[in-house]
């Protein structure tokens, strides 16, 4: 059980905007594709792409949900132009996040899998909403016992809080249904995976075992052998993902106000990048 004596990190991005801007400038030089660097009229822009990336991460750290409200803090900054250029940075943000995955050593860590809801409207509008009508649907939020319209984010997090990868599905998709595909796409070197009661089932455990992973989930209280099986240390480690999701919610991962698919992806990627960036700065500085 020595691996369960882990050190948690707060994951708040405690860095000045100047340093954040310098980090984003370095990332841009290293990872930005030529199609982005050498597009037309780049010599005429007043605000660099790296500065826009820094501003997006800064907005997430400030916890400001509305991009329109954030743009009002800056004199002469057009919200529509800022929003359009932010969406152009989506491939770069995606590349940076996956590069961080390769640089962070998670060997020996236990992985935790869970999901969180991303509603795109208030519950009263569940059956009248028109946005994302072909890719979102109605799901159930068990923590608040309410039905919502939107998406569900399935995430894999290390036991000390690094978000390794995620997948977005319709709100109605069951947690266990997305697990195998998410593990296939991620290919983590870690072999131990913790989940909640939503991942119970011999079929899922067998599929993951065939892939080389051991899945542990707590038994429900009314199940036979629950007292013996339910290791309280493992259950405590699994619950740490709740704190990680709470911080992702602060970074606006759950409160996504985008009204286009590209905007939705961009804001979710920024939230995850800000979260993992805070992890790396706190751990390696």
Label for each model-derived stretch:
Residues 1-285:
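Short alpha-helical elements
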